[in-house]
Curated annotation (Swiss-Prot):
InterPro entries: Ribosomal_uL5, Ribosomal_uL5_bac-type, Ribosomal_uL5_C, Ribosomal_uL5_CS, Ribosomal_uL5_dom_sf, Ribosomal_uL5_N. Transmembrane segments: none annotated. It holds the Pfam family Ribosomal_L5. It comes from Acinetobacter baylyi (strain ATCC 33305 / BD413 / ADP1). This is Large ribosomal subunit protein uL5. HAMAP family: Ribosomal_uL5_B. One of its GO terms (biological process) is translation.
Length: 178
């Protein structure tokens, strides 16, 4: 079992229940999924860039990403409907907790000039979204083998009903907020 999942079940659940004043154990907020998204806008002109993004995402997430397609043609961005423009991965269960553990303990400390995540990035329903500017903060990525620096969006979906519950959940996991 993942280290973070064991810690959540054994100590963090009770701490959250007491902190939020919840009586029913099924109401305690938990993380349901983590979605990683990498938009590769330049893939419209160079298809090889998307292959590199898919390879990086597969190393980071531990599972094969799905290629996302443009929903409509936009002349200003020089893309057509149905063209591949990015990739995404949805992590659940054990892989989700393993990724979250690596993110909190290894990747976040390696971010340059990091002062904490914004606590305003909650969506109003307890879900948190953040962006990373470079994929090289993850130890799985070999700096010498990447073709270019790419960023990614990370969305953490929770069962929390409010932003305060979501913020409390993320703080107990060890997320550094400003």
């Amino acid at each position: 079992m993942a280290r973070l999942k064991t810690r959540y079940n054994e100590e963090l659940k009770a701490k959250l229940q007491q902190e939020l004043g919840i009586k029913n154990v099924m109401e305690i907020p938990r993380i349901t999924k983590i979605t990683l998204n990498m938009g590769v806008g330049a893939a419209a002109t160079d298809k090889k860039l998307l292959d590199g993004a898919v390879a990086d995402m597969q190393l980071i997430a531990g599972q094969k990403p799905v290629v996302t397609l443009a929903r409509k043609s936009i002349a200003g961005f020089k893309i057509r409907d149905g063209w591949p423009i990015g990739c995404k991965v949805t992590l659940r269960g054990e892989q989700m907790y393993e990724f979250l553990d690596r993110l909190i303990s290894i990747a976040i400390p390696r971010i340059r000039d990091f002062r904490g995540f914004s606590s305003k990035s909650f969506d109003g329903r307890g879900n948190y979204s953040m962006g990373l500017k470079e994929q090289i903060v993850f130890p799985e990525i070999d700096f010498d083998k990447i073709d270019r620096i790419r960023g990614m969006d990370i969305t953490i979906t929770t069962t929390a009903r409010t932003d305060d519950e979501g913020r409390a959940l993320m703080r107990t996991f060890g997320f550094p907020f400003k």
